Amino acid sequence: MNENSVVNIAGYKFEPLENPVDLVRMYQQKCDELKLKGTMLISKNGINFSLAGTQQATDTIIAFLEEDDRFLNIPLKVTYSETQPFRR
């Protein structure tokens, strides 16, 4: 890994969610701010995501997710790539 590497994170957690639409809006805005690309699926059953960006951006989104106790300690798969794997 070098400083120009793209950090790829993936994780999921089954957790009953009463307000998935509100969460989608909030996390979409945060991902846009951080220039993260990929997919984040949020439903009444939980969360599933595959995101890619800078180390700082991926660290920030994980910290942001963990501000919600329901998303603490999501097991992550972390890989690195030389290019951005997602178009949006």
Model regions: which residues?
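Short glycine-/aliphatic-rich beta-strand segments at the starts of folded cytosolic domains
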Residues: M1-E18
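N-terminal intrinsically disordered, compositionally biased regulatory/targeting segments
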Residues: K13, L51-A52
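Short amphipathic alpha-helix segments
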Residues: F14-K35
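Acidic, two-metal ion nucleic-acid-processing modules in DNA metabolism proteins
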Residues: P20, K37, V78-S81
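Short, surface-exposed charged micro-motifs
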Residues: T39, S50
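Short Gly/Ser/Thr- and Asp/Glu-enriched loop/turn motifs at secondary-structure junctions
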Residues: I42-I47
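Helix N-cap motif at beta-to-alpha junctions
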Residues: A52-T58
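Extended, charged alpha/beta regions that create polyanion-binding interfaces
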Residues: T58-R88
